[in-house]
Amino acid sequence: MADVVVGIQWGDEGKGKIVDRIAKDYDFVVRYQGGHNAGHTIVHKGVKHSLHLMPSGVLYPKCKNIISSAVVVSVKDLCEEISAFEDLENRLFISDRAHVILPYHAKKDAFKEKSQNIGTTKKGIGPCYEDKMARSGIRMGDLLDDKILEEKLNAHFKAIEPFKKAYDLGENYEKDLMGYFKTYAPKICPFIKDTTSMLIEANQKGEKILLEGAQGTLLDIDLGTYPFVTSSNTTSASACVSTGLNPKAINEVIGITKAYSTRVGNGPFPSEDTTPMGDHLRTKGVEFGTTTKRPRRCGWLDLVALKYACALNGCTQLALMKLDVLDGIDAIKVCVAYERKGERLEAFPSDLKDCTPIYQTFKGWEKSVGVRKLDDLEPNAREYIRFIEKEVGVKIGLISTSPEREDTIFL
């Protein structure tokens, strides 16, 4: 059976800590979408690890880690991540169906961002998915056969010729790209496998599989705050499509949310707090992007968005992260509905334009940091947790009270 860990906000919810905390109980941890535009930060024994492509199970020697087919892979960046770990043989597997991000994709991404101003990371994620949908992409499995790779690259060179100047690819792009693959392909190829068959077999044997999403539900290309979204499907349903596991294989869906809200880049954010309180949340929560180091926009918990995300993903339980960031705040707000043109909205609309938050205010608490038992939380903190559970209709199974792995309350 497989369990899914999925972000139910705009990403950066703390999925990495949760996966790291529970990965020891699984045979496989699988990253199922996105690229190196995402980042997980894990603190293990006082050491901070920043992962962008590697599944969060790499810190457990007995855990097998898979990068599955809907992930887009920068071979250069993955090689750099691999070099930081030892003994990955028979512990890391990359789907032969996953698509390769080319340097051209990053150049195109940067070019388009100048006019679109979506707030992308300019890592080439979107353009790589574009080539995938156009059926002209290069897949990881192509790196295993020099002849096939050469054919695919020649087709790529022909296709991008009219755009070389606009995308600032340089006169030696073809030669440089050939050298790029000669440098990195030998380091990556030993890890490339048919992970679809591997996971189907593991599921049939009853092995435990943890499916790890990137970004968050509200950035989903179809169901998120379009056009300010990522280029992949970020919901739990994508886990089945990417891995080849059928929906019957899914057991638990764990939705990850912070005790407040954050967003990176442009796009609507009804509960954003642009007063000094927003700055306080950013500073105390260390809200800066793992990948880009950009400061995250911060605000109050949005229950309209949270209920929507829980319904989309079929969440069976929630993990409430960074409760300790709210320590010491006298009045804590929660967005319980939106108002738009005089109308109260309790359902999440396809367009958040002109939506303003309707808040309910709660009394704060002094300290929750480091608490590991529910009964040790102050009454106001417990009331806040109970309110979220009641409004969303999904039980909270886990609460994080610091970045440390052990500072976790299990319910």
From Swiss-Prot:
The record's free-text note on cofactor binding: Binds 1 Mg(2+) ion per subunit.
Gene Ontology biological process terms from the UniProt entry: 'de novo' AMP biosynthetic process; IMP metabolic process
EC number assigned by the record: 6.3.4.4
Sections of the chain in a coiled coil: none
UniProt binding sites for IMP: D12, E13, G14, K15, N37, A38, G39, H40, T121, R135, Q215, T230, R294
Keyword set, alphabetical order: Cytoplasm, GTP-binding, Ligase, Magnesium, Metal-binding, Nucleotide-binding, Purine biosynthesis
Subunit note: Homodimer.
Name the record gives this protein: Adenylosuccinate synthetase
Species annotation: Helicobacter pylori (strain J99 / ATCC 700824) (Campylobacter pylori J99)
Gene of this entry: purA
